[in-house]
Amino acid sequence: MVTLSPTGASVPTTLNRFFEKLSSQQTPALIWYSVNGERIELSGRVLMNWVDKSANLLVEECELEPGEDFDLQAPLHWRTIVLGLAALRVGALLNQDEPLVAAVFTEQEAGYTNDPAYLLAVDRAPLALSYTGDLQALSSYADEVLDYCALVRSFGDQYSGMLPDDSAEVLEGFTYAEAYEQALAQAQIYRTAGYALPSGQRALALELSPDYAFDASEATMSALLEVLAILLSGHAVFVADPSVDWQDEQLASLMDSERAVEIPRS
């Protein structure tokens, strides 16, 4: 089921239906910039391919089921956004307390996890086919360490597992239905704001604030809700690597080239 926004665009009424709609979107959904001209652009369809591959990995390799605990301990990155959305796709509970699955980039981040059964080692490099760090160094932090980049491409492009129930919790005391309702409300604000470039052109993308990170369950939820809100508003998500010391003019030029704008914060 879908409803109509005031602009006439159809808006999926559940998270599962939103994912279905996103999978048919040919226009950009996620744009990532990092050092040395690194640029990743994912259409809605390609983003959902990555999300669904990751969700299948979580289910088939890590035995993650709806309601099972999942933890992200990593900075903002296009791959951590994918993994966070994959956890929602599966219906996981975002919880740091002895999660079944955790995901990290580094050994330092692994030290912040709490005895996961499975630890996903994720690499930052844009075209990494495997983890370039020391997998052995991560082995003391989990029962099993898995190389996310080496494994994820082998999984199906369409999610084949169980879909989450809207009444299930995504955080303790906070359901999937409540989370999606919050994302819809924020999306409506973004949709009606009429964001535009200084030239007057309509903005095609909104910047995901570099203040977001995946270092606590609540922080992960906040970041994912913002991603969902931007996508639901009809914009792409623009992410500039927060680990880079961007010069104002450099970042402004990148954003202008993508017709992206910063979301004003009160």
Predicted feature locations:
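Conserved AMP-binding/adenylate-forming core of the ANL superfamily
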Residues: 30-64, 157-214
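Flexible, low-complexity linker/hinge segments
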Residues: 4-13, 108-116, 120-202
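Extended, compositionally biased accessory segments flanking or bridging domains
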Residues: 2-5, 16-42, 48-49, 142, ...
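Conserved AMP-binding/adenylate-forming
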Residues: 57-93, 97-98, 195-235, 239-241
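Actinobacteria-biased recognition of intrinsically disordered, low-complexity terminal regions
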Residues: 1-26, 249, 257-258, 263-266
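Polyanion-binding and phosphate-handling cores
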Residues: 13-23, 31-35, 45, 52, ...
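Conserved ATP-dependent adenylate/AMP-binding module captured primarily in the ANL superfamily
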Residues: 93-114, 127-137, 141, 188-204, ...
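Long terminal accessory regions outside catalytic cores
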Residues: 1-11, 34-40, 46, 55, ...
